[in-house]
């Protein structure tokens, strides 16, 4: 029997949902296993650091399951240094909130402690995902070490033809990857601890992120030579449910006729409603404008240009403005 450091599996909250629902089979396999809450200025509890490796076909004992509760910009403005002055004014609240969760984690005492303990990789998953079978993680982590991969992104943003490279090829899992570009996602990924520390250090030194977060991450990757791969067909292993975020957005809107219509539509068209409610820009920090809001603004411009005088159209447009802008 050998003792090794456990690989942390960290659930990052983006919606109101228990972390256990991201890994629904966790408690089924290890009855006494619970998520440890870790927030700013805390480290992983000692009892979770070491595991005796033995017959464990489901691999749950390889990992320390963590619920990250730090980086909440709603409660504290100490994370503003992650963003430039322009982004603090023009980036949407949702964008800043979600990015700050990850950057605060990478910049935390928790990650510094992991580096000191020689923990190589961390698995990070936002809680609007579901991973039912984690057995793919063990061979993936080994392959990442062998192939010197710094980040493995487990959600695809752009689909199409890519040049794929074999990552894992065994009797249970066949996994390919391709090199990432500007298609950056923080939804689910495995990252080398030292890489996370280096990225956040570069962001802070440059004065914080501007509005083009994903372009800036790609730029930093090129500058400090980070090898980021994207898992091909990642939805087979990590299920992302756009309905959960879309419902969360409607629940946080002011209650009105259109928000109720939207809540009902989410159940039938989750992908469409997720896209329509995605915030695009903040109006000087006063309110965020999403895709529906942008359409409404363009429609208002159309009515003004063509001098539309229909009271019904102006009334309906006004209700959209109060609901989505």
UniProtKB/Swiss-Prot annotation:
It is a single-pass membrane protein. One of its GO terms (biological process) is symbiont entry into host cell. Residues 307-325 are intravirion. InterPro entries: Poxvirus_P35 (IPR004900). Signal peptide: none annotated. Keywords: Host-virus interaction, Late protein, Membrane, Signal-anchor, Transmembrane, Transmembrane helix, Viral attachment to host cell, Viral envelope protein, Virion, Virus entry into host cell. Does not contain disulfide bonds. It comes from the Viruses. Disulfide bonds: none annotated. Pfam families: Pox_P35. One of its GO terms (cellular component) is viral envelope. Induction: Expressed in the late phase of the viral replicative cycle. Residues 1-285 are virion surface. The chain crosses the membrane at residues 286-306. Immunodominant protein. Envelope protein that binds to heparan sulfate on the cell surface and might provide virion attachment to target cell. This is Envelope protein H3. The lineage of its organism: Viruses, Varidnaviria, Bamfordvirae, Nucleocytoviricota, Pokkesviricetes.
């Amino acid at each position: 029997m050998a003792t090794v450091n456990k690989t942390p599996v960290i659930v990052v909250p983006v919606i109101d949902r228990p972390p256990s629902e991201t890994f629904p089979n966790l408690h089924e396999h290890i009855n006494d296993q619970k998520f440890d809450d870790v927030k700013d200025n805390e480290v992983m509890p000692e009892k979770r650091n070491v595991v005796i490796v033995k017959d464990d076909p489901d691999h749950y004992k390889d990992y320390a399951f963590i619920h990250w509760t730090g980086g909440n910009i709603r409660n504290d403005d100490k994370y503003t240094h992650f963003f430039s002055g322009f982004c603090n004014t023009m980036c949407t609240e949702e964008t800043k909130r979600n990015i700050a969760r990850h950057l605060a984690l990478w910049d935390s005492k928790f990650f510094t402690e992991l580096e000191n303990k020689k923990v190589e990789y961390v698995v990070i998953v936002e809680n609007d995902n579901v991973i039912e079978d984690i057995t793919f993680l063990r061979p993936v982590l080994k392959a990442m070490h062998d192939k010197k991969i710094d980040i493995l992104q487990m959600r695809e943003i752009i689909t199409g033809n890519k040049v794929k490279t074999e990552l894992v090829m065994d009797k249970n899992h066949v996994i390919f990857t391709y090199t990432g570009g500007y298609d950056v996602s923080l939804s689910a990924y495995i990252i080398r601890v030292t890489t996370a520390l280096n990225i956040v250090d570069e962001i802070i030194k440059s004065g914080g992120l501007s509005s083009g977060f994903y372009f800036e991450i790609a730029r930093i990757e090129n500058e400090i030579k980070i090898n980021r791969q994207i898992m091909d067909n990642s939805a087979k292993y990590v299920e992302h449910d756009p309905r959960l975020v879309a419902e969360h957005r409607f629940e946080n809107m002011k209650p009105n006729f259109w928000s109720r219509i939207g809540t009902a539509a989410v159940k039938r068209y989750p992908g469409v409603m997720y896209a329509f409610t995605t915030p695009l820009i903040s109006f000087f920090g006063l309110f965020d404008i999403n895709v529906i809001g942008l359409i409404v603004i363009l429609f208002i411009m159309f009515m003004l240009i063509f001098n539309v005088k229909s009271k019904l159209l102006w009334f309906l447009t006004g209700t959209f403005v109060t609901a989505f802008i």
